[in-house]
From Swiss-Prot:
One of the GO BP terms on file: neuropeptide signaling pathway
Statement: the UniProt record of this protein carries the keyword 4Fe-4S: no
Keywords from the UniProt entry: Neuropeptide, Secreted
Name of the protein described by the UniProt record: Extended FMRFamide-2
Organism annotation: Tyrannophasma gladiator (Gladiator)
Entry similarity comment: Belongs to the FARP (FMRF amide related peptide) family.
Cellular component, GO annotation: extracellular region
Disulfide bond annotation, renumbered to this chain: none
Location (main, coarse): secreted
Coiled-coil parts of chain: none
The keyword Secreted appears for this protein: yes
Compartment(s) of residence: Secreted
Function noted in UniProt: FMRFamides and FMRFamide-like peptides are neuropeptides.
Amino acid sequence: ADYLRLARA
């Protein structure tokens, strides 16, 4: 999972 992108959501 792309946690780096999810945190930017």
